[in-house]
Amino acid sequence: MAVFKTLTDADIATFSTGLVAGVDEVGRGPLVGDVVTAAVILDPNRPIAGLNDSKKLSEKRREALFDEICEKALSYHVGRASPLEIDELNILHATMLAMQRAVAGLARAPELVLVDGNRSPAFTHQGLTLISHSIVKGDGLIASISAASIIAKVTRDREMDALDAAYPQYGFAKHKGYPTKAHFDAIAEHGVFDQYRKSFKPVKALLER
């Protein structure tokens, strides 16, 4: 596996003519819920305008692109690791596992897997070992990684909205489970439940009181 700091879709075309899957994650920092990843294989014959790092897009734009990606992609799949797996493995290894699940779930096998960040797990698809590279800030450079970041972000945000409906006293729709003051205040008042990551320091400290 190589790590690239600058790489574009045009560069990739010079060394891979097969299917390319982009992979990204969301939700490593929150105190609650799954870490969510996505793998996306885009169709070069059906380009999608406006793809970018999901964090740089408005919620409305992310939602619109989410629908377009789902419609036009050759294949996409969401992988995740649960709070229990995060507590057992640690957040890094759980994220790598979720990425592997996303790629393994693709309907088609990619020739190359490109991962946002500076590290990548080993990937297999139906017993075939895949070539993978990581690209620093790849979600703003590579269209398939941008698409994966959008799929993962929208998926997790919707899950936080659903959790907010079930537990409105925590304010998940606003902070999405991240460690904000409002979230800490809610935890102090209402405690934690089974979707919390009990190995994370703020949660662990509360449980040890």
UniProtKB/Swiss-Prot annotation:
A divalent metal cation binds at D24, E25, D116. It is found in: Cytoplasm. Keywords: Cytoplasm, Endonuclease, Hydrolase, Manganese, Metal-binding, Nuclease. Disulfide bonds: none annotated. Residues 18-209 form the RNase H type-2 domain. Manganese or magnesium. Binds 1 divalent metal ion per monomer in the absence of substrate. May bind a second metal ion after substrate binding. NCBIfam families: PRK00015.1-3 (NF000595), PRK00015.1-4 (NF000596). Endonuclease that specifically degrades the RNA of RNA-DNA hybrids. PANTHER family: RIBONUCLEASE H2 SUBUNIT A, RIBONUCLEASE HII. Belongs to the RNase HII family. This is Ribonuclease HII. The lineage of its organism: Bacteria, Pseudomonadati, Pseudomonadota, Gammaproteobacteria, Alteromonadales.
